[in-house]
Amino acid sequence: MDDIIRVEISQRQPILRIMNQFDQDFYVDAHGLKIPLSENFTARVLAANGYIDEPFAGKVDTLHTAIAAEVFKTADFIRNDSLWSAQIAQIYVDQNHEIELIPRVGNQRIILGNADSLDAKFHNLYLFYKKALPQAGWGTYKSINIKYANQVVGVRNQSTKQDSIMAARAKADSVKAVPDTALTIKNDTSQIKQ
């Protein structure tokens, strides 16, 4: 024995923080392994919560449920794209195990469905952001559904509908409220020099 101990250390890089439905928090690293939270450091990573039934035993472990694997796949896709990494703040899993994304800009929910065809879904969302939102406005939609192939379904906010109806009525009322005297020409000749 040569009295030499060799130690290899590799640091895990968390890319996702999951808060499961059992009120357990844990990170998932870049390799898809669950790791416990640190008492000394909080990683600034994408958060996922909702109906995620992935158990956590407090130690490094693999992902066991299909929904956790889909959430990881989605988070990995988002972190590798600078636009979506800046735009998406949170992943939420609803009771039907459908993935929703919460953006940093805008109040709408982005319904992703599952983690299939992420390139196509995010490309469709990009086109919607580029073409529809500049015309309609960022607060127009309460949800943007990108889970279907080759289509984006936007559901308008009820308040936006009411605002546009009220704006149309206000415009019509303002046209009616213009007094007739503003449109008539006065025939006052007292100031004309002869």
Q: What label would you give each PLM region?
A:
Residues 2-194:
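Charged, solvent-exposed interaction patches on well-folded alpha/beta domains
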